[in-house]
Amino acid sequence: MKGKTMIDRKEDNQFHLVSKYEPSGDQPQAIETLVDNIKGGEKAQILKGATGTGKTYTMSQVIQRVNKPTLVIAHNKTLAGQLYGEFKEFFPDNAVEYFVSYYDYYQPEAYVPSSDTYIEKDSSINDEIDKLRHSATSALLERNDVIVVASVSCIYGLGSPKEYADSAVSLRPGQEISRDKLLNDLVDIQFERNDIDFQRGKFRVRGDVVEIFPASRDENAFRVEFFGDEIDRICEIESLTGRNLGEVEHLVLFPATHFMTNEEHMEEAIKNIMEEMEVQVNQFEAEGKLIEAQRIRQRTEYDVEMLREMGYTNGIENYSRHMDGRKEGEPPFTLLDFFPEDFLIMIDESHMTMGQIKGMYNGDQARKKMLVDYGFRLPSALDNRPLRREEFESHVHQIVYVSATPGDYEMEQTETVVEQIIRPTGLLDPEVEVRPTMGQMDDLLGEINARTEKGERVFVTTLTKKMAEDLTDYLKEMGVKVKYMHSDIKTLERTEIIRDLRLGVFDVLIGINLLREGIDVPEVSLVAILDADKEGFLRNERGLIQTIGRAARNSDGHVIMYADKITESMQKAMDETARRREIQMAYNKEHGITPQTIKKEIRDLISITKTNEAEVAEDTVNYSAMNKKERQEAIKKLQKQMHEAAELLDFELAAQIRDMVLELKSMD
């Protein structure tokens, strides 16, 4: 029998936080208040933490004390990756998982009527992220001490958690099951037999031994040994060498896809799909849209044939309403449905993330409606969608919004605002002054020279690309080592630029949006904001407070706003900064603390990825000249580099190396 009563979910695991630090400053009161409110049943709270006050550490303390499965949502993959790394360090003994979109590249299916262009869905799936997604869903069904760090893709349709759990194959030594029955069960849950290329989501057979590689792992697999029609023993093995790592008393294998359905449901789904197709064809024909009628019939019949034969088809998610047995308009199952009822949600940088959650649904519907109107998809495809904001809210049992500048939405949800203003380093919010725009270039140059003489760095933020480029050229002419960071720069390059700034390869960084993640540089003692009085996204109260915060990592932090008038946003930002600074100074005086610039080691993933890229480039030269043995060695070396890159969450590099491994394998 498969699944159902076989998953023994551990309910009594405890979160165990490992850190050399103790809560300090106003962290203890923030932690205490948040925990008391959660235990007291409060639904929503805001942790309003200034930049550099250790919000992630506070979140970790809260998770440990509340001891509930927790979903942490960030507004992009890079930020999610940083948080995932931090939480993994804080909770080495618990399940810290990572759930983001598994597409390295994604071109959604679309239709442009004006040019009669149909764009087929095109994507490349990142195998490493797919593994981590499977690891997240299986952990949620197996234990209670789980933290999932996710991007907003966690509100997209995922498939039924009940079907996923019920389809799981449960194996124990002494269990009566024939080898062939196990093989059939594995194929049913979308595992693929491959006796040569043994990797994630595959199994191989050697006589009475079946070796299985779960979809949620990438290093160790399992060996199931049979004696007749009974399992003799189950071992964990090293997938590359086959070395036995020890016996296992119970093995649960979750499906290799999140979109699972059983035979009975499949038949019902196919019946409903065909009925919907006939209705749609009749409607098109009645409107004289014969091309659309033929298109939808041809397409649907092909997909249904694939579902009958293979149990799967490309774009199966578009039929998820029928697969899940949902009614029209009902929300899809998402990662949130894999959590138990009583779980905690933390929204990082909530002023950005909540806006994303709100906007996802409308953009998705506009694109899909075009596909339905022109016969590329059935109307039920509209129900393969992200959650609406109110549907997301219905999943919320308890939530903490985390931001230095909470948005209007969060403030409407709750009046409980927990402040965290004191930095463990004693650092103060920077002093802010306003200077006129007349002669600003010369004034700025003088300030830059004063900083660079002391070995400090400068951030300058402009409003337009042209101004950023002109200013860069001017400063270069004046002998300043300067770089302009524009929006087209990739994450990896951005990390490299920040590293060079910290190392002193250049002294001044100019950009339009310096609020991007990872741009925290302790060496920056001056932030100059040009056109501070031009109201807008980066010059509103929140944008200004966040930008001012970029100078709060240095004990000499200073901010100059160049403007001809003081706008309401500027005044509010200055008032808030002054309020915090006063509280911080009073705390430092009372406790005899002298502010210390953060000493942050200049080491990040770029150092390792650069080495790997150099090694990879070196290796590519002689591939074709290698003999078989040398190629095998090269494959092992590359796979090691691939795992290192993946562990550092540099999935782009990991994917490049994986492609090279596949190329090498194809030569044999």
UniProtKB/Swiss-Prot annotation:
Residues 440-606 form the Helicase C-terminal domain. Pfam families: Helicase_C, ResIII, UVR, UvrB, UvrB_inter. CDD domains: DEXHc_UvrB, SF2_C_UvrB. ATP binds at G49, A50, T51, G52, T53, G54, K55, T56. It comes from the Bacteria. The keyword DNA-binding does not apply. GO terms for cellular component: cytoplasm; excinuclease repair complex. HAMAP family: UvrB. This is UvrABC system protein B. It comes from Streptococcus thermophilus (strain ATCC BAA-250 / LMG 18311). The gene is uvrB.
